[in-house]
């Protein structure tokens, strides 16, 4: 083999090596790209920076779905807007009993609560009778309260949302992840909602006995999470839902998770999203806008 052949062979090998390197790098980048998005199991979801409104992740975010007890955040806002005394007492009556799904409640008819206690039980423990009593005692009654809920939704730009009652027991209370993110951002501006929704537990007297209620979102009891506001929900047709605003790497983030199938799926999704934001997508949170 002459020296020209040796040079040609060497050049060919070098070119082949470089080409393989480029292909390998491209494959690595493609693989990394596939890992950029979190593996969210909920059927619909949205992640948004609460301070800027920037959407960081979405999955079927414009799909209109039943929202179950997420409804109670809107109920809380309109009742608080009415500026009724939180120390005034209200009573659970037969009108607050669930006739639609016959769901159970530990709040017996005749139980007397302060409005503050009713708010806490409705938001923290998703107590349907408490939410019903709050709206029933709204100025003008339930019908006026539902009308206020829909006006509030319209004012917030929730163009694909509809409310028909206070608790979320009706599948006709519907919204999208995009609209619910707007609602969570709005609700976070109410100090009482932030406080009531994130309490770990509350003991109230029902009849002659104290009754302990716990938060339906287990993450509020996890010291690793800094949660500003939260609400869970469940209906057979809505699946398991979770909305919350939390702080991740120093930035406020709204998470909306809808139509999860498993009991712990929505909580697992929240953890996956958080890890993704902390590791794979830090630039999206560190950017100042």
Identify the role of each PLM range.
Residues 30-178, 182-191, 248:
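Active-site-adjacent loops and short helices of periplasmic peptidoglycan-processing enzymes
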């Amino acid at each position: 083999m002459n020296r020209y052949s040796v040079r040609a062979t060497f050049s060919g090998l070098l070119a082949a090596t470089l080409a393989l390197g480029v292909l390998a790098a491209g494959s690595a980048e493609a693989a990394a790209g596939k890992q950029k998005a979190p593996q969210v199991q909920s059927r619909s979801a949205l992640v948004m920076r609460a301070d800027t409104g920037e959407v960081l992740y979405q999955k079927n975010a414009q799909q209109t779905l039943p929202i179950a007890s997420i409804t109670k955040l809107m109920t809380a806002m309109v009742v608080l807007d009415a500026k009724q005394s939180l120390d005034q007492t209200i009573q659970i009556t037969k009108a607050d009993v669930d006739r639609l799904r016959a769901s159970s409640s530990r709040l017996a008819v005749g139980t007397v609560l302060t409005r503050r206690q009713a708010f806490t039980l409705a938001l923290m423990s998703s107590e349907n009778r408490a939410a019903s009593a709050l709206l029933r005692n709204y100025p003008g009654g339930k019908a006026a309260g539902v009308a206020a809920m829909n006006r509030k939704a319209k004012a917030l730009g929730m163009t694909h949302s509809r409310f028909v009652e206070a608790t979320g027991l009706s599948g006709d209370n519907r919204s999208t992840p995009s609209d619910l993110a707007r609602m969570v951002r709005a609700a976070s501006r109410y100090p009482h909602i932030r406080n009531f929704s994130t309490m770990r537990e509350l003991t109230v007297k029902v009849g002659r006995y104290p009754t302990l209620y716990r938060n339906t979102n287990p993450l509020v009891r996890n010291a690793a999470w800094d949660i500003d506001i939260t609400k869970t929900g469940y209906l057979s047709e809505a699946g398991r839902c979770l909305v919350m605003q939390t702080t991740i790497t120093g930035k406020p983030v709204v998470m909306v998770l809808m139509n999860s199938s498993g009991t712990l799926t929505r909580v697992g999704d929240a953890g996956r999203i958080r890890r993704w934001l902390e590791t794979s997508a830090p630039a999206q949170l560190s950017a100042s806008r």
